[in-house]
């Protein structure tokens, strides 16, 4: 008997928690389909009496959401590719190659992780300003191409690969780059996927950096664009909700498809930490 | 080896963003900075017309949301990538002219015989600093009282009139709020100076900042009384409380028919006019009179940034935008009232459903928007203390006295 | 043999070159630049003047700063233990023999995927004084309508709820992985010895979970200290609650990019850095005392 009650309590708790977790999203959807007048009705309605699919069209008319989307997509994509390429190259070098100063340089990289991001913000902003890159696509992804965390993560994974696999390639006469490209890289695919996911999530949702470097309506990201919509003198709630869902949708779909990789990847950062 | 090419190709994706830079041969590109998404399409049309008449010039519009516009302008001016032609406004004009960030326009005005007398005087003067003209007036905003005819009918209250007094308005608001469930009488945008107290204080014969910009008017009994009168609207149940208005915004509440009256700026007329649910039963009258019947006007000016590489082309564009033809076009689109007086009536005629002539008439008795060298600093103090009055945590008298002290200090430091 | 050594060195430096250059230009040098800027005042339109310790002195006497620091500590002290406890409980529950584990994991992870702008927007609406669904539900219990986000007393706690909501799934996943790495044999041995489920939890699960708890603790602590996005989205600039809910980073953003006082803001960032470093070092120091190695 006790066991059954126990099981029931477990399900009950998890379901309650689940409801609390998802209610805001459900409410976002429901509100986005109402008219402005209905959204401010008391008592609030559970289902919109007139489904306003048009709100989603209005969002694109009110703000250049199409441009936001492209800016966010491109900058995130470039950041992911950049990090995968650069951090894997560096991670391999630190893991397997010998060169003078290697340990010291890596230590310096690690200290970057200890520092709160705000320290870098103003100087990075001024660099972008000096390069005349304020308000450009490049400004969005440039500092994000290089990651101490990514290097650290991939170095850890490279170190777990048995040396025998490399030895075979060395005997074949490959130089270190070929070993990296042909042998090592394919072997750390799970780590690459993890890094790609973490970087994509970070890039897509990032707010402060895009907010300060790109201020033209046509160069903003979804995150920053949504934030500036909220800050205006008037706010049409249903349209704001529709905009929020549109902004979230791509990452949501990406997550649902790659759920397993997301969860496994994030879980693994804990164990390697 | 093939794989190295793939690597290089990947790396070259990096330079996608760098392709932003314009490489148009022989054409002069003028960047035009503004902040209103409602007005942008109209200016795009005008820019296209200008480009047809001047085939060697291309206009690129940069729309920045207002909350970021000034930060961005400061940053891009420092970085040398500021737009050539910009929108300048009252709170910022003195800062920019004092730091010599704008091109003086007197010579060009004289050379092309532009008659600045054809523009609203208050706006022209706003952009004249120490005798030099830095901006050409673009538009003028005025405030008026907007009301919902249906809600007045439901409550059985007669419609507002152009000669209403503050007490008339309050009485009607209290009546509507008590009779109609879930509806408020009037929602004044307390958080918006131009929409509220910058009008109400002068209407009670007070002032915000002295003529010489040396002292604050908040110490005077007229100002204190005006603030108190605004607070009374909440206490006497003519208005929702501050938090409600703050969270839902006055215009939004009016648009969702939760409030019968609101004070509204002329630049807000366009979206309300296009809302079919409400535009059939809206009326507009002059703001109710207290001791006087004045309204604060503010208007944007076209200016040229100092760092521009194309001053002549920039001037040609401004000349075009300030012409009667362009102003008629702007007025007909209904987005804003031009500062060019002859075009103003066309703005009202654009509104088929709502009679907005009250906004034009309000221009007859106007005072200009209060500014100084460091407007942002003292208006921040002002808004912070007034917020306490609106939420009832500080009395009008105490708040105004505190504003006077701090504002005077800031003004003293300016000179 | 020498050839091999130079070959390794050549490729070593070449392969780290992009990351090395990038991190140098965008992180390492900026790190020192920030400290330099904190001793200067950067003009509105460029140019900087040395002001020595002026910025730090101004911060020291600034009431707003101390209030924001107090707020930030409040955020940390409430959100971190509460959030991690909830995540732990959920992880433990998910680790039992139940069905639909995958579905639950996904549902709890959803808030992590949402961007702060979107989450902030919907929660702001939920918290709305007159039309928000929270006040509507509470009114059934006789509660008056409260302005959760704009009332100075409640504002901070309202933000805390959202902060916890956004992070629960993330920590839960990491803790779940930690739980799954505990050998089942330990539990079996304990059961044979007659230990109850509760005893098992406190004497096996918790101690062996401490490495994961430590990791999650540090990550959550540091990120909570830096809270900005959600406050920016939810608390109105003209609200009287702004003082009671502003965090140090909110203040930093305001001075750096709204008031355009970048020297002062750099000093704020430097102070934040020292505080976080101190706390992190402290965490590592007491690690031996409670974390199972």
Model-found features: residue ranges?
Chain C
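A structural signal for multi-pass alpha-helical bundles of membrane permease subunits
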Residues: 4-293
